A protein has these predicted regions:
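Domain-level signature for proteins that mediate thiol-based redox and metal-cofactor handling
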Residues: 1-122
Length: 122
């Protein structure tokens, strides 16, 4: 499969990959390694503002690249972060995700929503 230049750049560099630790860190995940796609986000939140984001992902290059992009572009008030920094359709176009892989973007979105929900519940 041929990947877009943007997908390859984020896949190879994987900026913000890893975990965050501390009392002000919130974690959410979605998907299943057994099914081929799993994503986890960690958010460090201070005063209701996202200070840092990290991700772990298991899946195809599109999954890893989009997760990296989302973590890199996370920021702002956590109350406004219940949706991805960009919509699933926009991310699909930005990263040239083929139709048969777009379900993976929904897993990324579910992981993001789970993480923000965890932050809002504390």
């Amino acid at each position: 499969m041929k990947y877009s230049e943007l997908t390859l750049r984020y896949f190879e560099a994987a900026p913000d990959a890893g975990v965050l630790l501390g009392p002000d860190v919130y974690r959410g995940a979605a998907g299943s390694r057994a099914q081929g796609t799993w994503v986890q986000f960690d958010l460090q939140v201070s005063g209701g503002i996202i200070q840092a984001a990290r991700f772990l992902a298991f899946g195809c290059p599109h999954t890893i690249a989009v997760s990296a992009w989302v973590a890199e572009h996370a920021g702002g008030p956590v109350c406004c972060g219940a949706t991805l920094p960009e919509g699933v359709q926009d991310l699909s176009e930005r990263f040239a995700v083929p139709a048969e892989k777009r379900g993976r973007l929904l897993i990324i979105e579910d992981a993001w929503v789970a993480t923000v929900t965890a932050a809002l519940q504390r």
